[in-house]
Amino acid sequence: MTTSTQAPSTKAQGEELREQVLAAARRAKQAAAELAVANRDTKDALLHDMADALVRRAPEIIAANDLDVAAGREAGLAEDMIDRLRLDDDRIAGMADGLRTVAGLPDPVGEVLRGQVLPNGLQLQQVRVPLGVVGIVYEGRPNVTVDAAGLTLKAGNAVLLRGSSSAERSNTVLVSILTDVVVEHGLPADSVQLLPCHDRASVRYLITARGLVDVVIPRGGAGLISAVVEQATVPAIETGVGNCHVYVDAKADVDTALRILLNSKARRVSVCNAAENLLVHQDIAAEFLPRALSELHSAGVTVHGDEQVVEAGGPNVVPATAEDWDTEYLSHDIAAAVVESLPAAVEHIRAHGSGHTEAIVTDDVRAARQFSAQVDAAAVMVNASTAFTDGGEFGMGAEIGISTQKLHARGPMGLPELTSTKWLAFGDGHVRGTGASGVNSCPAG
C-alpha cells in the first residue's frame, strides 16, 4: 500500500503491532458508546474549542509540518505531493473554519427519517444513529486528520486515523491538540486515535478488525483505495479516483469554457476533483483549441492530445497514449481529445471516467439535460468547474471523502453519510399474532 514504508521485520513484531491496533479499536468502541449519546451542545462546543486550539497552537503545528516537508523533499517527493503535505497559517485557519462550519450544521443523530402508526396502533420511527467506530486510511494530507475528526465526532462516532508516514509529525501534533480538547470536555480520550504509520500491516489489521471497526474509508490514490477495498473484511466505502472530464459542447461560450477549464485543471492539480481529461466537440474545436492550449501552456500544463489536438500544435502538446485516458495525473498534465458529438463524449466518459465528477459547458439546454441524464457520476456539473465537488463547497463544512460507489453514500460525504439508521417501535403491550392461515404472516418471522 502506498502509505507504507516497510513490513514488520519479525513475526513477534507483527503480533505486537496487531495487538496495538486491535487494542486501539477496542478502546474506540468503548468511546463510541459514550459519543453516541453526547448531545448537540456538547459536540458543537467541542468543535468550536478544537478550532480555537488549532489557531492558538498554529506555531506548534507548523514547526512539526516543516519537519515533514523537509523530510519529504529529502525523500524526493514531487512538488505536487509537497503541496498536499504543507500546512501554513492560512490552511490551519481553513481547517479551523471547517470545524466551526460543521459545528453549525444540524446534528444528524436522532433525526427521524420516516414514521407511521400501524393499523394495530404500533408506532414506528426510522432514526439516524452513529456508525460507531470509523477507520480512515489516508495519504500525506494532514488536513484530513482534522476534517475526519470533526465530522466523525459531530456524528457521534469514534475515529481511528491511519495516516501516511510522510505526515507523521504533523498528524501527531494535530491529534494531540484535538485529544486535549476532547478530554477538557469530559469525553473519552480514545475518541480520536492515531495508529502507527510505518508498517503496511497496521492498515491490514485495521481493515480486518471486523466486530471492532464498523466501517473503513480510504482516501488517497488508486493503489491505496483498491488495496483497502479488495482486502477489507470491515465494510469499506470507496472514495474514488478522480479521472474527471470537462466536455466543451458545440454550443459552448468559449470564454466561459476557458474559465471553467482553467479552474478545473489548474486551480489545484493535486486534488481528486481536478480535471484530467478535456473533450472538445469538433464543431467548436477550431475556435476553442488554440486558445485553450495557449492558456494551459501559460498555466504550466502539458496536454496529452489525440491526433487533432496534436495538429492544433503548441509547445506543451504531446501525443496521448492509450493509458493517458485512464490516468489520474494529480499533476500539471491533462489528456485532450476532439469528439464528433455529445453521444461520443458520453461514450468516452463511460469508457474512461471514474464516476467522480464530469462537467459540460454548453448554452444548449437540451444538451445539458442529455449529458446530465446519461453520464453516470457522483456529481455532474453544468457550466461549472469540477472543483465544486467538495464538502465545503456543498455546504457540509468538510468532507470525509468523495464516494464513487452507489451503496450507502455517493459523492461528498458529510454528516448524514457518517450515520446509519435504527428502527424504533413504541407499543402498549403489543404482541404479534398470526395470519389468517394460522401461521406467521411474515415468512421470516
UniProtKB/Swiss-Prot annotation:
Main EC class the enzyme belongs to: oxidoreductase
Localization in the cell: Cytoplasm
EC number(s) recorded for this UniProt protein: 1.2.1.41
Pathway where it operates: Amino-acid biosynthesis; L-proline biosynthesis; L-glutamate 5-semialdehyde from L-glutamate: step 2/2
GO function terms (MF aspect): glutamate-5-semialdehyde dehydrogenase activity; NADP binding
Reaction equation(s) it catalyzes: L-glutamate 5-semialdehyde + phosphate + NADP(+) = L-glutamyl 5-phosphate + NADPH + H(+)
Any one GO cellular component localisation term in the record: cytoplasm
Coiled coil start-end: none
Keywords: Amino-acid biosynthesis, Cytoplasm, NADP, Oxidoreductase, Proline biosynthesis
Matching HAMAP family: ProA
Family to which the UniProt record says this protein belongs: Belongs to the gamma-glutamyl phosphate reductase family.
Biological function: Catalyzes the NADPH-dependent reduction of L-glutamate 5-phosphate into L-glutamate 5-semialdehyde and phosphate. The product spontaneously undergoes cyclization to form 1-pyrroline-5-carboxylate.
Annotated protein name in UniProt: Gamma-glutamyl phosphate reductase
Organism: Saccharopolyspora erythraea (strain ATCC 11635 / DSM 40517 / JCM 4748 / NBRC 13426 / NCIMB 8594 / NRRL 2338)
